[in-house]
């Protein structure tokens, strides 16, 4: 009887622990897949069109050609709802899909508000893109633990200065 109880304990305890720990996971994969490819060929391009300093940000939306000064090409893609390109407080580049994961609509996109949080205009969810990797800090997204979709930002594999990709 004690061996049976020990075996059950060894099976049940890890399952319960795994179930409880999964509750704290931020779901940042709610949006459908969409191509992302924003290329900055040189450091000068990055400084001119990208984000240059700590807590800086720029919106990239292919359909609206936003920002207008960026050299758009046929190979430029900006995800599901556009790309919010920013830097954290240490100047490290970050990128997120602008579509609110609560609304899941390419037409409902977050914008940086006066408190430096990304805010959804419809559900008023708030996301910290500068310190919490797009994690939710208010509104329905915080209640459901829905974060912004995170994109990769790094040096290109063909010599580009910086590339934003999925």
Protein language model regions, located:
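Processing junctions and N-termini across compartments
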Residues: 17, 94, 114-117
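N-terminal pre-ligand scaffold of iron-sulfur
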Residues: 26-112, 128-131, 149-166
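Secretory/periplasmic and organellar redox-cofactor proteins
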Residues: 5-7, 23-27
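Conserved SAM/SAH cofactor-binding pocket of Class I
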Residues: 144-147
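C-terminal motif of bacterial Sec signal peptides marking the signal peptidase cleavage site
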Residues: 18-22
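Short metal-binding segments enriched for Cys and/or His
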Residues: 127-139
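Cysteine-rich micro-motifs
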Residues: 116-125
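Bacterial N-terminal signal peptides that target proteins for export
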Residues: 1-11
């Amino acid at each position: 009887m004690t061996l049976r109880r020990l075996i059950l304990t060894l099976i049940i305890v890890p399952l319960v622990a795994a179930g409880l720990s999964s509750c704290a996971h931020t779901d940042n994969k709610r949006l459908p897949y969409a191509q992302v490819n924003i290329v900055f060929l040189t450091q000068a391009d990055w400084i001119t069109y990208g984000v240059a300093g700590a807590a800086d940000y720029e919106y990239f939306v292919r359909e609206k050609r936003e920002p207008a000064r960026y050299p758009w090409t046929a190979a430029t893609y900006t995800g599901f709802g556009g790309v919010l390109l920013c830097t954290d407080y240490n100047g490290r580049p970050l990128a997120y899909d602008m579509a609110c994961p609560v609304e899941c609509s390419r037409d409902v996109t977050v914008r940086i508000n006066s408190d430096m949080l990304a805010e959804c205009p419809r559900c008023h969810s708030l996301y910290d893109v500068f310190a919490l990797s797009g994690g939710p800090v208010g509104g329905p997204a915080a209640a459901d633990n829905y974060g912004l979709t995170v994109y990769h930002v790094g040096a290109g594999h063909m010599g580009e200065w910086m590339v934003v990709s999925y």
